[in-house]
Structures are given as structure tokens and as C-alpha cells.
UniProtKB/Swiss-Prot annotation:
It holds the Pfam family DUF4186. The gene is yneG. This is Uncharacterized protein YneG. InterPro entries: DUF4186. It comes from the Bacteria.
Length: 119
């Protein structure tokens, strides 16, 4: 898999993307559930909400809050197919491959790890 450093450098320059942070509630949820469960949640959300060629309510399918993965998706531009096309060069209108889904989960997970390791 390619390095995520260039992507995260670009995301950090976006005023919208860089404002997202995990709150105390989301941090606690991550601690209670553990990394494997959170990673599985991310994989499930990606498979259900992003993987279809034409996801239901595309552009609005990811809530802005309510789960650490949702926050991470907005922070990493993995929230809808439009953002995936713009930020990750993953074309719209085609079902996501397993490899693409793994990449998206890795991006989300990386952001969560960085957030959890900040004071």
C-alpha cells in the first residue's frame, strides 16, 4: 500500500477536513471497544455505505457525529463517493473493489490512531 503521508499532508491543508477531532465521548468509545472492533465497524460502514456503485443518499450517507468512524470519514474525505473521487481518485459509479475498501479502512484507521495518540 502506498504511503498515506502525502494524503494526510493534503488533508491538513483543508480548513474543513482539518477541523475534525475526536471528542472525549468518542475517545472513550474507542478505548472501551478496542481497535479490532473499531476497525471492523469501519469495514462494515464502508461495505454498506460506500462500496455499492450507486450508494443510497450518496453525499449524505455519513452522519457528522455519533461514531468515531463517522468523524474519521469526514476528516479523511472517505465519507461519500464524491469525496473519494476528489481526494482519493476512486471513480464514482463503479462498485468498490476489496482492495479499495481495505485502503479506505486503512485511511480511517490511521486517522483514528493519530487522534487517539494525541493528548
Amino acid at each position: 500500500m502506498q504511503s498515506l503521508d502525502p494524503l494526510f499532508a493534503r488533508l491538513s491543508r483543508s480548513k474543513f477536513r482539518s477541523r475534525f477531532r475526536l471528542g472525549m465521548k468518542e475517545r472513550q468509545y474507542c478505548l472501551e471497544k478496542g481497535a479490532p472492533v473499531i476497525e471492523q465497524h469501519a469495514a462494515d460502514f464502508v461495505a454498506k455505505r460506500l462500496a455499492p456503485a450507486l450508494p443510497a443518499n450518496d453525499g449524505k450517507q455519513t452522519p457528522m457525529r455519533g461514531h468515531p468512524v463517522f468523524i474519521a470519514q469526514h476528516a479523511t474525505a472517505t465519507c461519500c463517493r464524491g469525496c473519494l473521487a476528489k481526494w482519493h481518485n476512486i471513480p464514482q459509479g463503479v462498485s468498490l473493489s476489496e482492495e479499495q475498501q481495505r485502503y479506505i479502512v486503512a485511511v480511517i484507521y490511521h486517522w483514528l490512531v493519530v487522534q487517539m495518540n494525541q493528548p
